[in-house]
């Protein structure tokens, strides 16, 4: 019986050899998205010309899993597994991941050890969130018995916060900053940031075997961040996607680096990963240069004695040795990201607050504010959510007027104001360049976009990633040539390389910067003055950001 099956398999393969697809379009015409090869359970890729006659082609067969479609990954209405009973042990996976015809990961072995805390890092758009979704969907042979939870931040439910989070989640909600009054609010009435906190509370309360956290630090203040760092240490296995270096350093013990279709595993936290990767890259570069030198010497010998009869045999030997050597490929260098803010020169005080009070209705938000913003100020404002930090920035930017007191602005003042919600509400179907040309000439628009690494002539705003939208926001304000940058949570959605580029650009900027941020690494690298917003006032903190965090006593 087995010989018959074997014969049928080989007959099938011989037929397949005679029918290579020359293009994806040809495969589509015959209604084929992939061809399953019986004896390997593999999938023949049809994105490029392919034939089973080619040894290289046969190696391209994708073995463990069929392609994963993004729409299928996001079809679940809940982030929690309710039909699983628990799982003891480690996961040993081989990961192949495709989305909409694009290869994300190729045959990458990955072991997830029970009880470990992992950081998943990589550039924007490389597939980190897609990988988390695939794990949530139990691709790669993940057992049904394993309870997996992944927060779906876009899921809005019609119930109170405490009902949504669970009966035992009271202390968790408190740790994340919820008051008793907020805990009885409907989820639909919360801002995106507070909804995310409620999802975090539910996830932690569920105590899954594997918790998947995608950018959990966005919109959390430093108090909540400190609390979450401590709580993660008590959980079971966790995989975290975050661009907050300090948070990853304090929560993770292994780093998964998604890069070049691979998952490289590093022991230690993020800081340790950076050192190890730097050493690995330097070692690869030295090995490449050494091999290049060997080949150059051999080629030089061949060229010199090619027509020397006495050395003919030695030359032929060198030629054969050189031909047998594998193709030498230079180690890939990470592209350098550079941001540039232009400015309008200014000197002295740009803005002065004199006994400023601001109220919403009958409730005073800020009061008694008296301070100056000078042309070289580098100010970061920190404090718990809901204390009035964003309101203060809007007063600076002229988006709000003082209820009492006065705000004196220099005649030369030009403000560039960045807030994430402005970017999120742009028209998704509008072309990026057309949008920029509403305010600038085409040359100015292109220059502003290029200053932040954007070349998106034919792209609509809706197709941009979160990080690209933030860059678009920077490009918009850069076209104004401001001398005061007012930035509300500018690092949300940026990858680490872009955060570094932003910090460096602010360091070179010839003007003042006032920013609200909770990213401790970004604050340390970009700002000299720390102000605390609490109890309706804003006061100077004389110390660094780590001293401020330590003083919270969380």
From Swiss-Prot:
GO MF, one example: ATP hydrolysis activity
Coiled-coil residue spans: none
Domain ABC transporter residue range list: 89-285, 351-554
PANTHER family: ATP-BINDING CASSETTE SUB-FAMILY F MEMBER 1, ATP-BINDING TRANSPORT PROTEIN-RELATED
Sites where the protein binds ATP: 122-129, 383-390
Signal peptide (residue range): none
Name of the protein in question: Probable ATP-binding cassette sub-family F member 3 homolog
Family per similarity comment: Belongs to the ABC transporter superfamily. ABCF family. EF3 subfamily.
Protein keywords: ATP-binding, Nucleotide-binding, Repeat
């Amino acid at each position: 019986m087995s010989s018959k099956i074997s014969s049928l398999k080989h007959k099938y393969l011989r037929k397949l050899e005679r029918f290579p697809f020359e293009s994806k379009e040809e495969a589509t015409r015959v209604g084929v998205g992939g061809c399953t090869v019986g004896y390997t359970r593999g999938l023949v890729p049809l994105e490029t010309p392919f034939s089973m006659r080619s040894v290289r082609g046969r190696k391209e067969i994708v073995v463990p899993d069929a392609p994963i479609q993004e729409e299928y990954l996001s079809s679940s209405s809940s982030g929690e597994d309710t039909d699983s009973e628990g799982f003891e042990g480690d996961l040993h996976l081989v990961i192949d991941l495709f989305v909409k015809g694009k290869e994300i990961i190729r045959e990458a072995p990955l072991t997830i050890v029970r009880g470990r805390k992992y950081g998943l890092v990589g550039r924007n758009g490389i597939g980190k969130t897609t990988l988390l979704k695939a794990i949530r969907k139990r691709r790669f042979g993940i057992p049904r018995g394993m309870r997996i939870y992944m927060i779906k931040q876009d899921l809005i439910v019609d119930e109170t916060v405490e009902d949504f989070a669970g009966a035992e989640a009271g202390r968790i909600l408190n740790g994340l900053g919820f008051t008793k009054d907020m805990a009885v609010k409907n989820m639909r009435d919360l801002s995106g940031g507070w909804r995310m906190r409620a999802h975090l509370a539910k996830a932690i309360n569920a105590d899954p075997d594997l918790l998947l956290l995608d950018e959990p630090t966005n919109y959390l203040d430093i108090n909540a961040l400190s609390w979450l760092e401590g709580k993660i240490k008590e959980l079971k296995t966790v995989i975290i996607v975050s661009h907050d270096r300090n948070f990853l350093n304090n929560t993770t013990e292994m780093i998964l680096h998604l890069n070049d279709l691979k998952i490289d595993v590093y022991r230690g936290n993020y800081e340790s990963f950076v050192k190890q990767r730097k050493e690995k890259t330097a070692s690869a570069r030295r090995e490449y240069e050494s091999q290049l030198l060997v080949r150059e010497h051999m080629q030089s010998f061949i060229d010199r004695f090619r027509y020397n009869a006495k050395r003919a045999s030695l030359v032929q030997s060198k030629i054969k040795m050189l031909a047998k050597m594998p193709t030498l490929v230079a180690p890939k260098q990470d592209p350098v990201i550079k941001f540039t803010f232009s400015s309008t020169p200014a000197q002295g005080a740009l803005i002065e607050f004199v006994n400023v009070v601001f109220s919403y209705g009958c409730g005073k938000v800020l009061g008694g504010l008296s301070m100056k913003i000078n042309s070289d100020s580098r100010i970061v404002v920190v404090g718990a959510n809901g204390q009035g930090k964003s309101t203060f920035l809007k007063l600076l930017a002229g988006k709000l007027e003082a209820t009492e007191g006065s705000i004196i602005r220099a005649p030369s003042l030009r403000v560039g104001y960045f807030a994430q919600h402005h970017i999120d509400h742009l028209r998704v179907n509008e072309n990026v360049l057309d949008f920029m040309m509403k305010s600038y000439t085409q040359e100015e628009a292109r220059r502003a976009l290029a200053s932040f690494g954007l070349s998106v002539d034919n792209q609509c705003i809706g197709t941009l990633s979160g990080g690209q939208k933030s860059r678009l926001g920077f490009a918009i304000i850069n076209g104004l040539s401001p001398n005061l940058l007012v930035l509300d949570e500018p690092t949300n959605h940026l990858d680490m390389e872009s955060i570094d580029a932003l910090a460096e650009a602010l360091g070179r900027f010839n003007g003042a910067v006032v920013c609200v941020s909770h990213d401790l690494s970004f604050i340390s690298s970009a700002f000299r003055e720390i102000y605390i917003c609490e109890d309706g006032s804003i006061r100077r903190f004389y110390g660094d950001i780590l001293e401020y965090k330590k003083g919270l006593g969380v």
